[in-house]
Amino acid sequence: MAIISSVNRTCASESLLELYRSYKYILSTSFNIIIPIISLFFLVYAIKQLCAQSIIQYSTRVLLITTILFAVCHQIAYFCFKADLLYTMLFKLDQPCNLQHSSYDCRFITIATTTSNCGMALVQLAMSIDRVFALKFNRVYYKLKSIPGITLALITLSISFSMFFILTIDDPLSGYVNHCGFYPTYSQDKFHIFLDVTLYLAVFNFVFDIGLMYYSYQEILWKRSYSFVNRFQSRISLKCTQAIFIISICQCISNVLYSGLLSLLMKLGRYMSSADYNLSLSLAYTTPYSCLILPILICKVLEYIKKQRTVGILSLRNQKQSMEGHMAMINSAWK
């Protein structure tokens, strides 16, 4: 059985010490430290790109930046606990009975990772809601500019930051864990429920985004106008929806992997040794890699939209359509 936490401080098992002495695990932990450093560069670059892009609607831009800020928060916390783990493996193995950390000492890292994982999951839902506003209330949405995004971002931030305190409301944080990557001793059942809810939310977002993408395409075709400005705004709305769809789908898959694998690992932990559990955890925790892929994906999507905008402007300027052709297009959109 994997001893990952305890009520009182316990000495490290021989198998865990052997794992900590393993060059493979040391190299793996060192690699895990490099990942957040590299990702922070791309995350900052993605924020600069979003601030410079006028093609992305204001509200959508706010939510994308919010997602990136959650990712930055996570990567900083992840770097801190991995660096502490590496320090333990290199310099503290001669104190096997002092390797564990109290849940209280790990509280800041746990708050940061819980807030970030919850926030990135909720922002996907917020971006889908934002797209619904953009499609159903197009004129009002354009007038409000960034207000819908700011409102949704504040709600998401409030829920995400409160999540740790809700999950540990009756936890004195007096237990001990092998390192700060583990959940508090007395709250593991609640965190397990949190992972299940995250999984269900990711699946819901996945299905909702597919339906929203189909609806948005039909809605744009129906609302096409002879006015160049209206047609251009429709194209912009559709391209933004496509961008959010691509990013949301990738994030949903990431959330499914993160919550599903961790939930499975927590169930199987009682049948595993501490060494096997630690190795499995380093593989199952996919969020750091998602935070690395996220800014790269955003930059690629922005580049694609920029190219499509140029093509769209040229096609709209050259487009000539009769009344019969316009009605045929509307009829085909609803078949």
Curated annotation (Swiss-Prot):
Cytoplasmic side: 47-61, 130-146, 214-243, 300-335
Subcellular location(s) per record: Membrane
SUPFAM superfamilies per UniProt: Family A G protein-coupled receptor-like
Gene Ontology cellular component list: membrane
Expression by tissue: Expressed in the AWA and AWC chemosensory neurons.
Keywords: Membrane, Olfaction, Receptor, Sensory transduction, Transmembrane, Transmembrane helix
Molecular functions per Gene Ontology: G protein-coupled receptor activity; olfactory receptor activity
Transmembrane residue ranges: 26-46, 62-82, 109-129, 147-167, 193-213, 244-264, 279-299
Pfam families on file: 7TM_GPCR_Sra
Main location: membrane
Keyword Metal-binding: no
Membrane topology according to the record: Multi-pass membrane protein
Extracellular side: 1-25, 83-108, 168-192, 265-278
UniProt-listed GO biological process terms: detection of chemical stimulus involved in sensory perception; detection of chemical stimulus involved in sensory perception of smell; negative regulation of Ras protein signal transduction; negative regulation of response to food; negative regulation of vulval development
Function as written in the Swiss-Prot or TrEMBL entry: Chemosensory receptor that negatively regulates RAS/MAPK signaling during vulva induction and the negative regulation of olfaction of volitile attractants. Required for the suppression of vulval induction in response to food starvation. Signaling acts through the GPA-5 G-alpha protein subunit.
Protein family per UniProt: Belongs to the nematode receptor-like protein sra family.
Protein name listed in UniProt: Serpentine receptor class alpha-13
Organism: Caenorhabditis elegans
Organism lineage: Eukaryota, Metazoa, Ecdysozoa, Nematoda, Chromadorea
Gene this chain is encoded by: sra-13
